[in-house]
């Protein structure tokens, strides 16, 4: 089945249900993308930092060559990493990422985090990661502001390298600031969003301003448990939640479908991933039923304001308090 779409403020239609590419292993990434296209996915959410964009591009190229899709049928999303925030570095790295994907433009290109770090040349290390030395040294840029970076992002649109641009992991004040200085308004805001971290005020702000919200990590701690993260292990998996399981039984759906529908029913886009064809189909088919007001209220009561995707949860990073 095809995903419903959401209209962006840039005028383009974005599939509401896409396929996330974080932690998709390089060895299987091309096949995973190809199989997801066969299953009906059209939006693919990647990033420089995921380290698998070449393989993603191979999967896309094979699907186009085999006649499964045309380029214009796909909606390819990628992100600008923090070490490339300098105005003169944005376009060159975008062109490199486009080359990895074997495409001429991104449908959507995002600022990955609201943090400008010192430049690391791709010939030294790519993806560069968080640390300047590749080990432990954090070096904030002393010259580059988010406004300057956004100006360079806008020029990507002017040059046809990106059709829409957006932001990721921004909190409310950064969104407010962007709305003041932006010539081209952010089309989307991608955030960690699940029943344990609902961020209702941030979601409301974005939607009120005509910015589409995309939820990542819709299944909460599950993806972070694989990283042996203590914070993720401190709470029960959402798939095992009695509330979510009861709603899945009530609607004769899987817990994953309930978690995804909780977002999509509220106008939020989702980007789940899986390597299993049957689960690919289930995740894509999450908009064919509705949760009632009582269901939504029960999930709203699950909010713990627990964030998993922040640097201080991965490593000792006392200079990387991005969500303070």
UniProtKB/Swiss-Prot annotation:
InterPro entries: AKR (IPR020471), AKR2D (IPR044487), Aldo/ket_reductase_CS (IPR018170), NADP_OxRdtase_dom (IPR023210), NADP_OxRdtase_dom_sf (IPR036812)
Taxonomic lineage of the native organism: Eukaryota, Fungi, Dikarya, Ascomycota, Pezizomycotina
Organism listed in the record: Hypocrea jecorina
Free-text function comment from the UniProt entry: Catalyzes the initial reaction in the xylose utilization pathway by reducing D-xylose into xylitol. Xylose is a major component of hemicelluloses such as xylan. Most fungi utilize D-xylose via three enzymatic reactions, xylose reductase (XR), xylitol dehydrogenase (XDH), and xylulokinase, to form xylulose 5-phosphate, which enters pentose phosphate pathway. Also major aldose reductase in pentose and D-galactose catabolism. Reduces the pentose L-arabinose and the hexose D-galactose to their respective polyols.
Protein family membership: Belongs to the aldo/keto reductase family.
Residues binding substrate, per UniProt: 112
Name of the protein in its database record: NAD(P)H-dependent D-xylose reductase xyl1
Record pathway: Carbohydrate metabolism; D-xylose degradation; Carbohydrate degradation; L-arabinose degradation via L-arabinitol; D-xylulose 5-phosphate from L-arabinose (fungal route): step 1/5
Disulfide bonds: none
Site residues, Lowers pKa of active site Tyr: 79
Single biological process term from Gene Ontology: D-xylose catabolic process
Enzyme class: oxidoreductase
